[in-house]
């Protein structure tokens, strides 16, 4: 399923997203995060030791809710982890997100030895207001 133009617009803007994955016991885990898109996938940059990535390795289902400035400007994407990207591309991507969200040339937090990973999220269903 391709991404709706509203999803692309919200993901390309400096809008925060809530990412929901499933813990091993089935409980949902929600985290607030930066989000991006390449036009085909939603992109979330994380660290490989984080719980959300562990959850996705076990169960690839994920929901991403992106909120705009207006409370009626949002998109919910229910989907699955389609692929991951690591290495220098993931490090460059977190720097890109730092510029987009906090106007910093590089990501302001230390990057651990595990590095960064981009989660490429494919949409299975998109819900929009209205």
What is the predicted function of each stretch?
Residues 1-16:
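Extreme N-terminal tail/first-helix region
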Residues 2, 71-130:
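Charged, gly/pro-rich active-site loop segments
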Residues 6-9, 32, 108:
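Short, flexible, glycine/charge-rich loop motifs used to bind or transfer phosphoryl groups or to couple energy/partner
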Residues 14-47, 63-66, 76:
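Short beta-strand segments
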Residues 29, 60, 115:
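Exposed loop/turn and edge beta-strand positions of beta-sandwich/beta-sheet ligand-binding modules
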Residues 50-52:
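Short, surface-exposed beta-strand-loop junctions and turns on beta-sheet-rich folds
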């Amino acid at each position: 399923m391709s991404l709706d133009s509203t999803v692309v617009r919200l993901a390309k803007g400096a809008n925060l997203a809530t990412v929901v994955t499933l813990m091993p016991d089935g409980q949902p885990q929600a985290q607030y995060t930066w989000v991006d898109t390449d036009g085909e996938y939603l992109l979330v940059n994380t660290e490989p030791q984080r719980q959300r990535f562990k959850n996705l390795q076990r169960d690839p289902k994920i929901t991403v809710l992106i909120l705009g400035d207006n409370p009626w400007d949002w998109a919910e994407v229910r989907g699955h982890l389609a692929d991951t990207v690591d290495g220098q591309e993931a490090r460059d991507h977190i720097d890109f997100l730092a510029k987009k969200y906090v106007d910093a040339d590089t990501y302001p937090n230390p990057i651990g030895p595990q590095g960064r990973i981009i989660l490429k999220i494919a949409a299975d269903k998109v819900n929009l207001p209205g």
